[in-house]
Amino acid sequence: MAKNSLKPSNPYNSEPETPQPRPKLPMIYYVVVIALLIGLQLAFFWSGSSREIPYSTFRTFITENKVESVRIAPEKIYVTLKPGVDSGLPKQEEGNDTTRKLLPGAKTPENEVTVNPVRDESLTALLETHGVRYEGSPGTTWISELIQWVLPFALLFGLYFFIFRRMGAGGPGAQFMNIGKNKAALYENLDEHTRITFKDVAGLDEAKAEVMEVVDFLKDPKKYTRLGGKLPKGVLLVGPPGTGKTLLAKAVAGEADVPFFSISGSDFVEMFVGVGAARVRDLFRQAKEKAPCIIFIDEIDAVGRSRGKGAMMGGNDERENTLNQLLVEMDGFATDKGVILMAATNRPDVLDPALLRPGRFDRQIMVDKPDLKGRMDTFRVHTKNMSLSPDVNLKALASQTPGFAGAEIANAANEAALLASRRNKESIEMKDFEDAIERVVAGLEKKNKVINPKEKRIVAYHEAGHAIVSWMMPENDPVQKISIVPRGMSALGYTMNIPLEDRYLMTKRELFARICGLLGGRIAEESVFGEISTGAQNDLEKITGIAYNMVMVYGMSDKIGNLSYYESNNPYYGAPGVEKKFGGETARLIDEEVKAIVESAADTVRTMLKEHRSKLEALARELLTKEMLQYCQIEEILGKRPGGQEEDSGEVDCSKKSAENGMVAHEPETTADAESTEKVGLSATELAELEAAAERLRQSRNVSDN
């Protein structure tokens, strides 16, 4: 999330200048050398495997004057026949010159044969009688035999020893030899200009304060131990993806004056049994040698999953061995003081309970998505090195990015810089940031995607329906922008609602209004064209989810009552899950209640669009002409929002310059009335409509009861 990076230090190097490492030969060179040695060894074996004939045939060849020369050795008689003489042995396959040069014994000439010697004192006389040239050859000594057999193996073992020495020094194959050693990177004595500090972490004030206390404990332990306090053994960072858990750990590495070991949870798991536990032991051994220090395990759920879940039947899960060793190292008989374990995960629900108990992870710090102030601080951090135009309003950008995590804000800021560079601007303007946010939220704009006029008209009325319902119901968030320009994978248009403030609670009326806003597109198509299309698929999915949550999770149904079927141990952190704890009759009742809520919302939307049909037509025509409308342009067509508060507080700038730039600068207040979630201003018409909807809902329930 920041441009700074951490560089592992080498604590074993005390020289002022780092020596240049020796060049490492590729592993293929060693393979070639081994192959050559094996070839030489085979040559020794093949050198003695010449063509052999019986001794009687040898004497016959002498008497028939077919022998040219003879070399007599103690172990063999080597005979050279005259050219053209057939030895009676089968022909050999032809070899090439390279083979004969590399392996001279691989192929014996056709006129050379061997004979096993026998005790024959008349052999020399027979050779002299027939004029055969002969000579003696001394036999091989035991030393030469020893060299012939031992030297190749000595060369092989020497090469083997050399390669494994290279492996131990970090050469080729070192990973195989060091498979039981941990892969943690050590950060120590980091450079002032490259390290990440707590100043680079924004929007995480509470989490940062908790972690800073741990760092301060390591720097000045007496400050805390004087009253009997103990050093915490573990800190678990929990939060959705992209919120800055790893960045917070990098800041700890940059701020702490103690060694910092960093490793990923997946680095403990290998294909070999016992490697994970060995790496855990080696990691804590090194950490204890450098205590006090910090160990950071990123994505600890890769190794810390609950035991017994996901294990193969009939086998021992390697992850369990690794986890058991981790539990022992964190709080077992052989634990030492001075080693703090930090870990990060976005799946705390799958972690083993023994890992989460106090004494191992004493603190669980929630790293959540930033609020309005946190988003503004995060924008400030990620734009501090950018050239910004004076019209850039970071507070307005923060208000336009509700629910953004730190990584998404960093991505939006980077996209804005790229857009400004693509447009050849000298600085990044507010328009660039708004386009970048829109690109992150809705996807890449597809200007070249051709839509036929009929479908374009359907999309225009669909988005206009969303906008009018959201605009006329003050419980909904204000409509910031409407577009019928295709974006992303499949979106043909979208309506962007921007909340005026961060909300943590929603009332039943607000959820009902949100369902109405989502139904606005489908009902508008039905009212104008007399038929519906597939464009409302995503809207219907959201409507179904909200309605079922109202009935099953939040207890907002009179028939179901104050019951919740919420399942906290869901497989995906942060997403509500539902576990079936009811029978078929209750399931039927739930479905009826959900359908009643959605049908009541649909009737409310039909009445509203019928009342504002002229505004629907005007908004759709303007969309077909301009393809994109901002807040001020929408306000010109639909008028002031009923019960809206942003106009009264001066939070919307509808000046001519702002309208020309196509942007609206929302600057919502960070404080809100404590009762704002319960009391919402309603017009008489809206109140009557909601009361009528409630009456229809009650009537439908009475009918179902009967």
UniProtKB/Swiss-Prot annotation:
Q: What class of enzyme is it?
A: hydrolase
Location in the cell = Cell inner membrane
Q: Which residues bind ATP?
A: 239-246
- The UniProt record gives the binding positions of Zn(2+) as 462, 466, 539
For this record, an example GO cellular component is:
plasma membrane
Q: List the disulfide bonds.
A: none
- The record lists the membrane-crossing segments as 25-45, 143-163
Q: Bias regions of kind Basic and acidic residues — which residues?
A: 91-100
The molecular function terms in GO held by this entry are: ATP binding; ATP hydrolysis activity; ATP-dependent peptidase activity; metalloendopeptidase activity; zinc ion binding
Membrane-related topology note: Multi-pass membrane protein
Q: What is its main location?
A: membrane
Keywords, in A-Z order: ATP-binding, Cell inner membrane, Cell membrane, Hydrolase, Membrane, Metal-binding, Metalloprotease, Nucleotide-binding, Protease, Transmembrane, Transmembrane helix, Zinc
| Quaternary structure and partners | Homohexamer.
What is this protein called in UniProt? ATP-dependent zinc metalloprotease FtsH
Which species is this record about?
Chlorobium luteolum (strain DSM 273 / BCRC 81028 / 2530)
